[in-house]
Amino acid sequence: MVHLTTLLCKAYRGGHLTIRLALGGCTNRPFYRIVAAHNKCPRDGRFVEQLGSYDPLPNSHGEKLVALNLDRIRHWIGCGAHLSKPMEKLLGLAGFFPLHPMMITNAERLRRKLAREVLLASQKTDAEATDAEATET
């Protein structure tokens, strides 16, 4: 268990610690720091510790980069820190937690939508092929 120092307790004044994303970067180029911060502090304000980073824009290889200090995340969760919803989803994708239920639901919806589009495209090409054969004869 972590003991909060008196200096930290004075600035704390109730609430709880939250592991969340702090926005950085510039216009049209977001970059997030994964931080442990008090829930009363502003989103981009003071934080207790930086636990990683997240770059949501794909790089030249189509990858979204995430750096996590899983030992420190495990430590803060053990100390009673709460997770924000985006962090729950991100840690689920990283394999640290089970996948968030909405991630599974959205993946199923997307899979069904893509299957429907492929089926419609194949039916359209079959119809065009039969029309082309009918006009040739």
Swiss-Prot record:
Residues annotated with Phosphothreonine modification: 130
InterPro entries associated with the record: Ribosomal_bS16, Ribosomal_bS16_dom_sf
GO molecular function annotations of the record: structural constituent of ribosome
Record's subcellular location: Mitochondrion
The entry's keywords: Mitochondrion, Phosphoprotein, Ribonucleoprotein, Ribosomal protein, Transit peptide
UniProt key word Cell membrane: no
One GO cellular component term noted in the UniProt record for this chain: mitochondrial small ribosomal subunit
Pfam families listed in its UniProt record: Ribosomal_S16 (PF00886)
GO biological process: mitochondrial translation
UniProt entry tagged with the keyword Transport: no
Boundaries of the annotated transit peptide in chain numbering: 1-34
Family classification: Belongs to the bacterial ribosomal protein bS16 family.
Quaternary structure (record): Component of the mitochondrial ribosome small subunit (28S) which comprises a 12S rRNA and about 30 distinct proteins.
PANTHER family membership: 30S RIBOSOMAL PROTEIN S16, SMALL RIBOSOMAL SUBUNIT PROTEIN BS16M
Protein name: Small ribosomal subunit protein bS16m
Biological source species: Pongo abelii
Lineage start: Eukaryota, Metazoa, Chordata, Craniata, Vertebrata
Gene symbol of the encoding locus: MRPS16
